[in-house]
Amino acid sequence: MKVKLYASLRPLVGGQTSVELETGPGDTIQDMLDELMKKWPALRDELLENGDISSRIHVFLNGREVRYMDGLDMVIPENADLRIFPPVGGGA
């Protein structure tokens, strides 16, 4: 599975815009995050807060934010589009 990462998360995975993870049938968002953090431990402090997805992080599965679906228990369907966004600011 390809996971796309944005902004300040990219340096934590060696500057890559996306990473490949091994996933199987029935894997959940929690499984995916565990795999990400196993490969790139620096992501842990950015992605998690008290054992859940940080309130500052937005994880989108097929264009919908997982926090408003089944959260960490959401099963990842085959050929899913998964994107993780950190907080982004800007403007004048």
What are these regions (language model features)?
Residues M1-A92:
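Ubiquitin-like/PB1-type beta-grasp interaction modules and other compact soluble beta-rich domains
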